[in-house]
Amino acid sequence: MPAFNRLFPLVSLVLIYWASVCFPVCVEVPSETEAVQGNPMKLRCISCMKREEVEATTVVEWFYRPEGGKDFLIYEYRNGHQEVESPFQGRLQWNGSKDLQDVSITVLNVTLNDSGLYTCNVSREFEFEAHRPFVKTTRLIPLRVTEEAGEDFTSVVSEIMMYILLVFLTLWLLIEMIYCYRKVSKAEEAAQENASDYLAIPSENKENSAVPVEE
């Protein structure tokens, strides 16, 4: 069961990828909010366009706010992705899609100081013949960095339930074995008693015990 819980997110992503390849759709999947120190962390930001065939000028801005601090720019996409001067410089990697519906970034070698609030701003200016509407979307990602990977609560509950089920099945099988053993033992004892009683009867009594046949 824990293995299924660990494989379920992977299977879901595979299905989403397969659907996106077979059918061009956009799915706004929320980002994970927990990272482990020293590992890369993908900050997922997806902003779907309802009409993909419409051309649009897209600008992406990533901000970071430490606990008790203020927002400051760490990454910008404007006619090409570029990293700005910040404490994250050299550790950010563009992970977006070509159509700029997925504008995610990856933080390399995550540290404990990277905990905080990340903001993804996506600004689009659509190019229609009559007008050029402007749309802005915002995604907030509260990130918590830990020293070691924590155990998933669902996996813990699944493991506990699995062990309880195994104990219950073991006890049930043990009770069934004891019940069957006693039942067989009683049947053997009854058979032995009947055989002993039959052997204890004298031969004369055995002949007399026969029922006479009336003429």
Curated annotation (Swiss-Prot):
InterPro entries: Ig-like_dom, Ig-like_dom_sf, Ig-like_fold, Ig_sub, Ig_V-set, Na_channel_b1/b3
PTM comment text: Intramolecular disulfide bonds favor the voltage-gated sodium channel oligomeric complex assembly.
PROSITE patterns, sorted: IG_LIKE
Glycosylation sites: N95, N109, N113, N121
GO molecular function, one term: transmembrane transporter binding
Record's bilayer topology term: Single-pass type I membrane protein
Residues passing through the membrane, by range: 157-178
Disulfide bonds: C26-C48, C45-C120
Occurrences of domain Ig-like C2-type (ranges): 24-138
Domain of life: Eukaryota
Residue ranges, Cytoplasmic side: 179-215
UniProt entry keywords in alphabetical sequence: Cell membrane, Disulfide bond, Glycoprotein, Immunoglobulin domain, Ion channel, Ion transport, Membrane, Signal, Sodium, Sodium channel, Sodium transport, Transmembrane, Transmembrane helix, Transport, Voltage-gated channel
Any one GO cellular component localisation term in the record: voltage-gated sodium channel complex
Function summary: Regulatory subunit of multiple voltage-gated sodium (Nav) channels directly mediating the depolarization of excitable membranes. Navs, also called VGSCs (voltage-gated sodium channels) or VDSCs (voltage-dependent sodium channels), operate by switching between closed and open conformations depending on the voltage difference across the membrane. In the open conformation they allow Na(+) ions to selectively pass through the pore, along their electrochemical gradient.
Protein family (similarity comment): Belongs to the sodium channel auxiliary subunit SCN3B (TC 8.A.17) family.
Protein name, per record: Sodium channel regulatory subunit beta-3
Native organism: Macaca fascicularis (Crab-eating macaque)
